[in-house]
């Protein structure tokens, strides 16, 4: 099955502490149905030092995965979150915005 949200897409968070925020998808975890969005859903992780690798210990801030159902693709034409559909054009499967019918770039 084709993914409606892909890496490098700009998305808006629909629910949770970061509701309404926009960011770029950096990673899609297909098996878990989650995405990692740049600058969104940041958590603090306590990390032990690893002297063999030269890593210092401390508290590290990183992005945690968000369920794909809690984000929507950002439509720059309308300035809002939008749903995505698929259709066949010239023998290729392409994504389009359901509200405007425009192709997703």
UniProtKB/Swiss-Prot annotation:
List the record's Gene Ontology CC terms alphabetically: ribonucleoprotein complex; ribosome
- Provide the leader sequence positions: none
* Sorted UniProt keywords: Ribonucleoprotein, Ribosomal protein, RNA-binding, rRNA-binding
Q: Do you know which Gene3D superfamilies this protein is assigned to?
A: 2.30.30.30
Q: Which GO terms describe its molecular function?
A: rRNA binding; structural constituent of ribosome
Q: Which CDD domains match?
A: KOW_RPL26
Among the GO biological process terms of this entry, one is:
translation
Task: Give the PANTHER family listed for this entry.
Answer: MITOCHONDRIAL RIBOSOMAL PROTEIN L24 (PTHR12903)
Record-given protein name: Large ribosomal subunit protein uL24
């Amino acid at each position: 099955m084709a993914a409606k949200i892909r890496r490098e897409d700009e998305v808006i968070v629909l629910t949770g502490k970061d509701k309404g925020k926009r960011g770029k998808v950096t990673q899609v975890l297909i098996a878990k149905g989650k995405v990692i969005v740049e600058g969104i859903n940041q958590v603090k992780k306590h990390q032990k030092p690893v002297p063999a690798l030269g890593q210092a210990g401390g508290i590290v801030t990183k992005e945690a995965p968000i369920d794909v159902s809690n984000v929507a693709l950002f439509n720059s034409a309308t300035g809002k979150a939008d749903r995505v559909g698929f259709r066949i054009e010239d023998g290729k499967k392409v994504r389009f915005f359901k509200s405007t019918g425009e192709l997703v770039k």
